[in-house]
Curated annotation (Swiss-Prot):
Bias-annotated ranges (Low complexity): 1-10
Source species: Uromyces fabae
Region described as Disordered: 1-24
Name of the protein in its database record: Planta-induced rust protein 11
Length: 24
């Protein structure tokens, strides 16, 4: 249950940093 997983569509598979990159 990663808090960043809810922010991005990446999912719990990627890290908070990776999510930010993917979202952008």
């Amino acid at each position: 249950m990663n808090p960043c997983s809810s922010n991005c569509s990446c999912g719990a598979s990627c890290t908070c940093s990776g999510c930010s990159s993917h979202k952008k």
